[in-house]
């Protein structure tokens, strides 16, 4: 067992593994692990080293010989040590052998090594193999497998030793070895099903459904085996397919198990009670087949080909044929590697291979050869991988290389989608079968450097003209995609805007539209529509041009016709419009004058409009009749196709996505209401009030300009009009997002309330409804035997009353089940340390139902303190029975407590008392009392004031019973006598009957004189009178005594049990969820099976002790932090492991391990995730037990079964084994640890931690990509090649810990890949390589930062039933959405904002998206996929580099486009971690914004935008990319407004028009900007948040939290994140450069350095903030219009707020951001950074230069369009200079253009001077120091002189100097931006150095501007205090000493370190 023990020194310093090998460190981790640290080219010797480690303890010499043999074999495998790491490995091994040779020789028993080996082999064979075989049923298969493998290796070594010593091997040994060899073939490590003949008695193999599937697959009758085939035992169809098509052996084994489990699970659902005759049901077969081939059949139909699934007519053969077809598909899928992302490519391969299969079975003869049909690629080993998969894979790989890690333009390489969509056209059949190597699919443009391939097997590169190019769609970086994808929405908004402006212009009342003229004018919207149609058609052609090579003729024709028809309408409509007027307006008059103006025909225009709209009529009809639309879209009739061809191009996906009529009605109503509100608001508040001021401004004349006006005679003041209207129009396009937030909050809230969310919010509410909880448990979590559909809804849940006290027979079962489930949940709380031992006792229900108590036993926390209160009431009751009874019965729980205590009192007394006389006395006393209870005069008859005294005695008795010690016997006897006395004397008041009975029992003293001692008889005193101490003590008895003790002694109320907030939240959510609508639970055996898949790269697995204890720069270690944040959980942990302090923990290895686990369960670690997911299995085992247990077992309880199974009956027939087998059938958990192989070989501690997890959870499976060096197969070449495998490993369950077994992983499957799996984004491919090892019908994708809870796992089988119901009446769900609970919001206010924002999105947001809007996609992680649906449609994520950056949402897009259906369920939740520091949050937001930028360009969004109906398209827009685009518009609005104001102020127009209302008091503009501010401060986030908190925790809480958030500066956070989103979204659309940003998963309470913040936010926030500040300052100086207006003040404040936030939020939210010492350190650090010289290899963190070059890298890949846009945007910085030079005192008199020219001269002069200085510095500063100083002095003097002259002669003022700075600074910045954009040109001109110097100057100024205010504030200590309070208010309110965490505890540490 040494493999699982790791000492404290075994921390992160693991990579020094080599040293561990060389030095002998017996029993250390390194020792047993050295068999794992083997170079990849020597993989074959690992088993030998494993055996050596295993036998070392029993025979060191044999271990030595094994190692020696391993060394020899290593030398044979790689004689020249050419493999990586081989030489070092051999050296280390040799050194070890030299060291061990002599000591082991001394210890040798036999004369020679050969004899020693033989004797050991025989000993091993007898001790292990024979002994295990004789153990019959109890043989542990894992141990047998291992024993056979070990014996095999030992024999191999033995043979080698005998050969060296030329000794014959004994006959006996050879015979034994023959048996071993035969068995080793059979006993291979298996995954779930052991399919070898000897395992037929394993529990899982005895299930009839499994047997049926196995038998069905073994039906190989009539299959034509190839010649020379050796028949094996138990051959099945998959073996035949392997022989014929050349699949890999492990792939066949993997898919065999997959298919058997799939069929068995579906079979058992068809027949809930299967007959014992195992025969596979045809219906089950058909169901699986239908799901598996639905996509394939659809593909065949789409391409007009007959499918290859030909079924025979004979019934017997039918089943065989179906199974063959399914097995073939799964085998292709299982080996397809990256081709799995291309579902239609797999269809193509399958189509041909299935046809070959049919040909072989039908005995067809090939027309070419005249022989029977054979597969085109033959059946030799690995033929399928080499000849089918690899060629296609190589194309994917080459294309991925051409993407240059995503830096190339999307249009220059084909991504997975392009390659897959090649198979959407009939042309794909030109590929042929066998595939032609010269087909266009395999062609690549212009030579690709073939570095990675070996010369021979690379394809000849074909010239570019054959390259297929992009298919169907080109992702081009452009904002136009937003308009193109959602053109209907933009058209609608623009037309509405036009109509509203016309109406407002002509009268203003909406009713005026009915006036003839206005109506005619409004009709002009159709002309606009035609123009937009033309724009759309042209845009389509331009953006799709790069895909023209792959387009068919009719698609090209459609594009061209669309342009021509749109152009025609653009001519026809205006002309007919002009002729509809008698007296036409200006624009129409012009047209009329061209064509002759005589005619007048109004009807012509109407006819034209109707014709123009006719195609839209079709769309309208299709919208109203969704079924018709579905039929038309799927139809293959020519006429229909022609009709549809015009309205939308024919595509394989995106057809038939309609919803049911009711769903359609719901989301249509939502949007109709929303749009109506929005338009009314826009019209009445923004547009109409602005019309009159606009008309006035257009009439006004301005002659007095304050700058050089280029167009002084321009009419209508058009510039002013644009400046006024632009912000309003932008807000008009954006404010739908605000309305969406409002409406979604309302509807989401109402919907949530109807779903019964938040009915149980607090523990008080739970207490009040606890009586109905057992009913709910049994109703929801226990399958209903009758299998009927239960009624749903509120009445159903409430009608289930479970409050009777008596327990009828079937209620007894219900109570037992409730107890099992409830106690499991409570125990899991205890294991997680959420509650203490006492709290657990108070919360548990008795496991062992006490049958003598005829009532329900509630958990003690409900009954606590009831008995002492009842006693007081009885004591003071004064003989009034009825009154007391009424008072007790008014409290149900008190009634239960009193009855239970009395009953238990009776039972315990009767159980303990054994003597006959004593029994008699007691029976009579109880009979008397019971009689009085029945007649109801107990209190009248008896004296109750003595009751407390009896109570005290009884409590003492219970205490003695709890301790159960022999020495207390005498005390117990006296106690009984005391109790008897109290009862008879004080309570019954000398009742004559009783007294006489007691006296007679004592054997009184009637004849005088003394009786001898031995004859004296005292009650209870004789030896057999009472049973004490109790022997044997059962668990049930212990539990009973403990419970009664709690009931009697708990004085205080248990209102605050459990006290832990997390435990409370979980209990209340779980209880509440049981009252919500959820499907009925099926039996575990009949439920849908499912898998969980977690991709893992290199994150934390388990914190090492060193990680936990190493303090950060503030002296805070993770452990200290966790102890302070979770103080109660830490104390509970110490209590659980029975330690008093941290020091005690470190004394034992086992406790140390516990400590590491405790900390890891509170971080975002893989350990936490695995524990959470393994609750599913625990839950299934428990539920299987409840399903299968007989009445007796059920009453004994699950705990008893578990205990029994551990003690004795490990038999495969035991109930426990059956429960485990069912759990195995239904649940698999695969963690895809991409790097596990590499970690293992390098001795990385993470590999050991993962191994620990597998040991802890034997059913956990780990998949990884193994990179192995193998010698090249081709003999002509030397050297090694890298080969990649997909590997699945497990650690076998080891039952007997005493054996030599070490816990090492076993390889189950090892499937070779065509090459490296990671070609795209990484995570999707990591999921994809492991998905073949998943099982079942559901697949839950879980990220490694998630968590799960025991109580939620119990609801999983209910959730999976959702797959069987049609949610919208049209289709079954393909993805079930789950809600998440964000568990990282506990400490800082930022984490709290983030978790609130995230929580509201995953609850109220997604609830609304799923229903009514029907546009929920897949947003990451806990969603459950319909596995068969997705594995045949491209998997659970998309993987193309960059475009699929947020890979998960594309799974949702894909699902929806392929007619899936995504739902959302709120009765079950999964935990999730989020980032907690501002920098991590910003990185996360940047990643999401980048992802949205890429989505905007993607084909999926384009298709959804075009294929959804109008309203669903609106939902799709506003919930995906629209949210980000609206954010962008929000920021743009501010810019446009400020630049508009700048134009008005500097040109003098504002002054000239200052009397105009439009300038002075512009309400619409104020409202528009107010709505912008709403978005800015996070209104869109806060509303749903408020509603959700209100729903789930009460509206008072919501309101107080809202106020708190404002106080903690939430608006600052939201305004700041607005900037992040805008910057990264905009930059991605323009330039690309989106990359996966790894965000933190750690604990963030550390201070971020100023330089870090500067690097992160400089471009996204600081530059923009300073630009806006500049605009505001200029406006403050020169603007005059309406300073006094309040609304204006508020708007200005809002803008200044944005500026302040963007500049200072990072410092505000930075822990210790205002601490003086930190500020000083930051300044030094920043100075060092800004002045460091960059260069190759200098990272951005070290030098400003490197960072600056990196920061503009995106411009290099941006393409011409991006550069042009960048330059145009930079031109805005020249406006300042142009405007401001005319506002100087010197230039007041002249408005000549020369002034502007002179200002440029000044700029160039300044630049020249700067250049001179820098050249001087380079040339002179070293040698001619004096010269250089003179030059500098001269320049300075000249500068001063010029300033003085200007002040004296030209009357220059201080303001002028400031204005000059304001004018010239932006110009310089603009020039810098342009220089950066044109870097290659500037470089060639030799100016790049100067540009860099200028840029550094700007950065220093910016840094100073930011740093100064922060440093100033840091002078005042109270600022730092305030900041800490604001940041960590959550912690303060929980009483945590955050100051200790922040300030660290350095003194404390240092003193400890000294010790």
Swiss-Prot record:
Extracellular side: 510-521, 580-604, 682-717, 1539-1566, 1619-1661, 1710-1761, 1814-1833, 1878-1899
Compartment(s) of residence: Cell membrane
Catalytic activity, as annotated: [(1->3)-beta-D-glucosyl](n) + UDP-alpha-D-glucose = [(1->3)-beta-D-glucosyl](n+1) + UDP + H(+)
SMART domains in the cross-refs: FKS1_dom1
The UniProt record lists the keyword Oxidoreductase: no
UniProt keyword Transmembrane, yes or no: yes
Protein name: Callose synthase 3
Native source organism of the sequence: Arabidopsis thaliana (Mouse-ear cress)
Organism classification: Eukaryota, Viridiplantae, Streptophyta, Embryophyta, Tracheophyta
Originating gene: CALS3
């Amino acid at each position: 067992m040494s493999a699982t023990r790791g000492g404290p020194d075994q921390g992160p310093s693991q990579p020094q593994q080599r040293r561990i090998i060389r030095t002998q460190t017996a029993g250390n981790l390194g020792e047993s692990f050295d068999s794992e640290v083997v170079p990849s080219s020597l993989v074959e010797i690992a088993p030998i080293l494993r055996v050596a480690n295993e036998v070392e303890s029993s025979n060191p010499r044999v271990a030595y010989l094994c190692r020696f043999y391993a060394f020899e074999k290593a030398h044979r495998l790689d004689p020249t040590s050419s493999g990586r790491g081989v030489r070092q490995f051999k050296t280390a091994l040799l050194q070890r052998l030299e060291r061990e040779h002599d000591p082991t020789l001394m210890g040798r028993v036999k004369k020679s090594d050969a004899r020693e080996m033989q004797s050991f082999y025989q000993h091993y064979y007898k001790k292990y193999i024979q002994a295990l075989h004789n153990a019959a049923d109890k043989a542990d298969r894992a141990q047998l497998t291992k024993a056979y493998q070990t014996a095999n290796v030992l024999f191999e070594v033995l043979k080698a030793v005998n050969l060296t010593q030329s000794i014959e091997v004994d006959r006996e040994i050879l015979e034994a070895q023959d048996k071993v060899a035969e068995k080793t073939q059979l006993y291979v490590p298996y995954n779930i099903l052991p399919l070898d003949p000897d395992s037929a008695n394993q529990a899982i193999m005895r299930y009839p459904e499994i047997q049926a599937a196995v038998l069905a697959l073994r039906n190989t009758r009539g299959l034509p085996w190839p010649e020379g085939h050796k028949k094996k035992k138990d051959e099945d169809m998959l073996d035949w397919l392997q022989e014929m098509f050349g699949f890999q052996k492990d792939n066949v084994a993997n898919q065999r198990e997959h298919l058997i489990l799939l069929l068995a699970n579906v079979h058992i659902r068809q027949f809930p009670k299967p007959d014992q005759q195992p025969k596979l049901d045809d219906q089950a077969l058909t169901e699986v087949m239908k799901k598996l081939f639905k996509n394939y059949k659809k593909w065949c139909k789409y391409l007009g080909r007959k499918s290859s699934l030909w079924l025979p007519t004979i019934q017997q053969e039918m089943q065989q044929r179906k199974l063959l077809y399914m097995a073939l598909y799964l085998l292709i899928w299982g080996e397809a590697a990256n081709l799995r992302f291309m579902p239609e490519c797999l269809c193509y391969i399958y189509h041909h291979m299935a046809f070959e299969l049919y040909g072989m079975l039908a005995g067809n003869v090939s027309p070419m050869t005249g022989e029977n049909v054979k597969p085109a690629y033959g059946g030799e080993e690995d033929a399928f991988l080499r000849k089918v998969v690899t060629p296609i894979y190589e194309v994917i790989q080459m294309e991925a290389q051409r993407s240059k890690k995503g830096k190339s333009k999307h249009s220059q390489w084909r991504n997975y989608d392009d390659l897959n969509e090649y198979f959407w056209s009939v042309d794909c059949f030109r590929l042929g079968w066998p595939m032609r190597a010269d087909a266009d699919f395999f062609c690549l443009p212009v030579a690709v450097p073939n570095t990675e391939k070996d010369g021979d097997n690379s394809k000849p590169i074909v010239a570019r003209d054959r390259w297929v190019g992009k298919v169907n769609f080109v992702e081009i970086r452009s904002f136009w995609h937003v308009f193109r994808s959602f053109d209907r929405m933009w058209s609608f908004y623009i037309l509405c805007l036009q109509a509203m402006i016309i109406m407002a212009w002509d009268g203003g009342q909406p009713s005026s539209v009915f006036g003839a003229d206005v109506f005619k004018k409004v009709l002009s919207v159709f002309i606009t529509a035609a123009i937009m149609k033309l724009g759309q058609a042209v845009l389509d052609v331009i953006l799709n041009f790069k895909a023209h090579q792959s387009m068919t003729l009719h698609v090209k024709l459609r594009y061209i016709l669309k342009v021509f028809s749109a152009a025609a309408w653009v001519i026809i409509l205006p002309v007919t419009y002009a002729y509809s007027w008698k007296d036409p307006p200006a624009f129409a008059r012009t047209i009329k004058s061209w064509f002759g103006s005589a005619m007048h025909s109004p009807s012509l225009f109407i006819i034209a409009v109707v014709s123009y709209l006719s195609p839209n009529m079709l769309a309208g009809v299709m919208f109203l009749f969704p079924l018709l639309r579905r039929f038309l879209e799927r139809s293959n009739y020519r006429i229909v196709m022609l009709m549809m061809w015009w309205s939308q191009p024919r595509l394989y996906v995106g057809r038939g996505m309609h919803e049911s009529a009711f769903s359609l009605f719901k989301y249509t109503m939502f949007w109709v209401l929303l749009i109506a509100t929005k338009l009314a608001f826009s019209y009445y508040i923004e547009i109409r009030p602005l019309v009159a001021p606009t008309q006035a401004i257009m009439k006004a004349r301005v002659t007095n300009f304050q700058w050089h006006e280029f167009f002084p005679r321009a009419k209508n003041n058009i510039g002013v009009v644009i400046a006024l209207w632009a912000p309003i129009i932008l807000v008009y396009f954006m404010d739908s997002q605000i309305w969406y937030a409002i409406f979604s909050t309302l509807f989401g809230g109402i919907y949530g309330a109807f779903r019964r969310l938040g009915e149980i919010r607090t523990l008080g509410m739970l207490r009040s409804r606890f009586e109905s909880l057992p009913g709910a448990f049994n109703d929801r979590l226990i399958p209903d035997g009758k299998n009927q559909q239960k009624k749903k809804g509120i009445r159903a849940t409430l009608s289930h009353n479970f409050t009777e006290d008596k327990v009828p027979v079937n209620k007894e079962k219900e109570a037992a089940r409730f107890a099992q489930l409830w106690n499991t949940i409570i125990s899991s709380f205890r294991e997680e340390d959420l509650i203490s031992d006492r709290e657990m006792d108070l919360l548990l229900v008795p496991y062992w139902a006490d049958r003598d108590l005829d009532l329900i036993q509630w958990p003690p926390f409900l009954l606590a303190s009831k008995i002492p209160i009842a006693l007081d009431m009885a004591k003071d009751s004064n003989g009034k029975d009825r009154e007391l009874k009424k008072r007790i019965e008014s409290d149900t729980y008190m009634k239960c407590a009193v009855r239970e205590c009395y009953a238990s009192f009776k039972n315990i007394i009767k159980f303990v008392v054994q003597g006959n006389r004593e029994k008699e006395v007691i029976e009579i006393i109880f009979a008397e009392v019971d009689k009085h209870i029945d007649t109801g005069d107990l209190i009248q008859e008896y004296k109750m004031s003595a009751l407390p005294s009896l109570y005290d005695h009884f409590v003492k008795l219970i205490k003695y019973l709890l301790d159960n010690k022999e020495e207390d016997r005498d005390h117990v006897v006296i106690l009984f006598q005391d109790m008897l006395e109290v009862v008879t004397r004080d309570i019954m008041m000398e009742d004559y009957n009783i007294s006489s009975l007691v006296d007679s029992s004592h054997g009184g003293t009637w004849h005088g004189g003394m009786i001898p001692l031995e004859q004296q008889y005292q009650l209870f005193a004789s030896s057999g009178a009472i049973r004490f101490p109790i022997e044997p003590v059962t668990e049930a008895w212990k539990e009973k005594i403990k419970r009664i003790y709690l009931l009697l002694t708990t004085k205080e109320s248990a209102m605050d049990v459990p006290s832990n907030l997390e435990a409370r939240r979980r209990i209340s959510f779980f209880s509440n969820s049981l009252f919500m609508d959820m499907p009925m639970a099926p039996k575990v055996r009949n439920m849908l099976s499912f898998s969980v898949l977690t991709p893992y790269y290199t994150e934390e697995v388990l914190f090492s002790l060193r990680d936990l204890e190493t303090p950060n720069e503030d002296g805070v270690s993770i452990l200290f932090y966790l102890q302070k944040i979770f103080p109660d959980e830490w104390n509970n942990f110490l209590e659980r492991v029975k330690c008093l302090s941290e020091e005690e923990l470190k004394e034992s290895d086992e406790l140390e391990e516990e400590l590491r686990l405790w900390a890891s369960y509170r971080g975002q670690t893989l350990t936490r995730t695995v524990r959470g997911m393994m609750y599913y299995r625990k839950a299934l085992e428990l539920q299987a037990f409840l399903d299968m247990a007989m009445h007796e077992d059920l009453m004994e309880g699950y705990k008893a079964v578990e205990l029994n199974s551990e003690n004795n009956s490990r038999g495969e027939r035991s109930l426990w084994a059956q429960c485990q087998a069912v759990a195995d059938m239904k649940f698999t958990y695969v963690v895809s640890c991409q790097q596990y192989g590499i970690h293992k070989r390098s001795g990385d501690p993470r590999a050991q931690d993962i191994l620990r997890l597998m040991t802890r959870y034997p059913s956990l499976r780990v998949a990884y990509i193994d990179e192995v060096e193998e010698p090249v197969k081709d003999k002509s070449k030397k050297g090694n090649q890298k080969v990649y495998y997909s590997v699945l490993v497990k650690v076998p369950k080891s039952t007997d810990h005493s054996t030599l077994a070490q816990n090492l992983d076993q390889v189950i499957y090892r499937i070779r890949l065509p090459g490296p799996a990671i070609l795209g984004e990484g995570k999707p491919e990591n999921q994809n390589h492991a998905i073949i090892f998943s099982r079942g019908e559901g697949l839950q994708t879980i990220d490694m930062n998630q968590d799960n809870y025991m109580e939620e796992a119990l609801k999983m089988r209910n959730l999976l039933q959702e797959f069987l119901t049609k949610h919208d009446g049209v289709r079954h769900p393909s993805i079930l959405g789950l809600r998440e609970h964000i568990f990282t919001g506990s400490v800082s206010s930022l984490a709290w904002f983030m978790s609130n924002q995230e929580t509201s999105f995953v609850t109220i947001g997604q609830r609304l998206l799923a229903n009514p809007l029907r546009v929920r996609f897949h947003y990451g992680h806990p969603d459950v996929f319909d596995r068969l649906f997705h594995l045949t449609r491209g998997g659970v994520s998309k993987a193309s580099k960059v475009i699929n950056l947020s890979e998960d949402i594309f799974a949702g897009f894909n699902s929806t486009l392929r007619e899936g259906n995504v739902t959302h369920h709120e009765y079950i939740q999964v935990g999730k971690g989020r980032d907690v520091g501002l920098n991590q949050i910003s990185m996360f937001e940047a990643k999401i914004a980048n992802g949205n930028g890429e989505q905007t360009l993607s084909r999926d969004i384009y298709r959804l935008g075009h294929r959804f109906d109008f309203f669903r398209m609106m939902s799709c827009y506003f919930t995906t990319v629209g949210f980000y685009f609206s954010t962008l518009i929000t920021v743009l609005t501010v810019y446009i407004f400020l630049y508009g104001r700048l134009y008005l102020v500097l040109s003098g127009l504002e002054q000239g028009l200052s009397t105009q209302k439009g300038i002075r008091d512009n309400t619409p503009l104020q409202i528009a900007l107010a709505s912008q501010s709403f978005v800015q401060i996070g209104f869109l986030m806060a509303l749903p948040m408020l509603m959700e908190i209100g729903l789930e925790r009460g509206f008072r809480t919501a309101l107080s939290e809202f106020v708190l958030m404002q106080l903690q500066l939430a608006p600052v956070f939201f305004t700041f994140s607005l900037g992040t989103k805008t910057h990264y979204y905009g930059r991605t659309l323009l330039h690309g450069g989106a990359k996966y940003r790894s965000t933190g998963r750690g604990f963030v309470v550390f201070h971020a350095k100023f330089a870090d913040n500067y690097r992160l936010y400089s471009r996204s926030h600081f530059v923009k903030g300073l630009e806006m500040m500049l605009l505001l300052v200029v406006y403050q100086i020169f603007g005059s219009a309406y300073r006094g207006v309040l609304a204006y003040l508020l708007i200005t404040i809002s803008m200044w707020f944005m500026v302040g936030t963007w500049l200072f939020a990072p410092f505000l939210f930075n822990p210790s951001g205002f601490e003086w010492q930190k500020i000083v350190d930051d300044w030094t650090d920043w100075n060092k950074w800004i002045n460091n010289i960059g260069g190759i290899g200098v990272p951005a963190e070290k030098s400003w230069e490197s960072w600056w070059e990196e920061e503009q890298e995106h411009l290099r890949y941006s393409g011409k369009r991006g550069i042009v846009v960048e330059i145009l945007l930079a031109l805005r910085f020249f406006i300042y200079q142009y405007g401001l030079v005319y506002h100087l005192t010197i230039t007041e008199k002249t408005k000549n253009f020369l002034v502007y020219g002179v200002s440029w001269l000044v700029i160039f002069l300044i630049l020249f001077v700067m250049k001179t200085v820098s050249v001087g510095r380079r040339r002179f500063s070293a040698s001619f120091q004096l010269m250089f100083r003179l030059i500098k002095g001269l320049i300075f003097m000249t500068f001063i002189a010029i300033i003085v002259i200007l002040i004296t002669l030209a009357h220059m003022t201080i303001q002028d100097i400031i204005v000059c700075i304001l004018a010239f600074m932006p110009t310089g910045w603009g020039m810098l931006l342009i220089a950066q954009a044109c870097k290659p040109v500037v470089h060639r001109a030799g100016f790049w150095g100067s540009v860099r110097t200028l840029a550094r100057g700007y950065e220093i100024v910016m840094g100073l501007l930011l740093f100064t205010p922060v440093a100033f504030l840091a002078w005042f200590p109270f600022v730092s205090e305030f900041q800490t309070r604001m940041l960590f208010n959550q912690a303060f309110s929980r009483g945590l000493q955050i100051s200790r965490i922040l300030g660290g505890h350095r003194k404390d540490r240092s003193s400890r370190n000294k010790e």
